């Protein structure tokens, strides 16, 4: 983590959805350490949740490997613009698209904008997530359960469905899963349930497209500062 603070980090709380720009110290997304080698030269990618956290790190890596990127995010405009700057600093095109991917129409609009403004689509990274911490099952409201599935599972389906027809010569669909799929945190029941549902490695591999899920452990991001704000 060149130039970045090392753990343990001070605990911080923010209202949803959280802001990377407000975190102290700032997370490390590979800004100073990642070096590309042209592995994605000329590729076009959509990354959801690319304003911060793992999504921003993926956007930086993809751009430094030669890909143009559509950055899909909810409403964190300052964070998204910083990711855009980092992509453009790597010499690649960056397109911003804000909105709630829990809405199927927004999912279709994201893909349409990528195809229109990037000139095609080769890679879809389903990374955006919603999570909230609750002390017990009884504390999870119906609306919270539905929201978790809309953002984490339904959006993945609608984005993939919209993307596949544009991947004429193959492509890649990558889903960000979680260690919670195997070792669920008891305070993250809804989130752990959907991450278990996501981790079916070959499910998106339809009509010649490569499909993968990638499980991650702890990653310091604005979501961590926000998810327990109202519920802990």
Whereabouts are the PLM-identified features?
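Amphipathic alpha-helical dimer-interface segment in Rossmann-like NAD(P)H-dependent oxidoreductases
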Residues: 60, 112, 151-171, 204-209
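Catalytic Tyr-X3-Lys loop
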Residues: 138-157, 174, 198
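Catalytic loop of short-chain dehydrogenase/reductase
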Residues: 129-131, 174-212, 221-222
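Short alpha-helix in the Rossmann-fold core of NAD(P)-dependent oxidoreductases
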Residues: 149-156, 160, 186, 194, ...
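Conserved mid-core segment of classical short-chain dehydrogenase/reductases
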Residues: 8, 103, 108, 116, ...
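Conserved glycine-rich Rossmann-like NAD(P)H-binding loop of the short-chain dehydrogenase/reductase
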Residues: 67-82
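Conserved amphipathic alpha-helix within the SDR
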Residues: 84, 88, 95-98, 103-119
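Canonical Rossmann dinucleotide-binding motif of NAD(H)/NADP(H)-dependent dehydrogenases/reductases
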Residues: 37-70
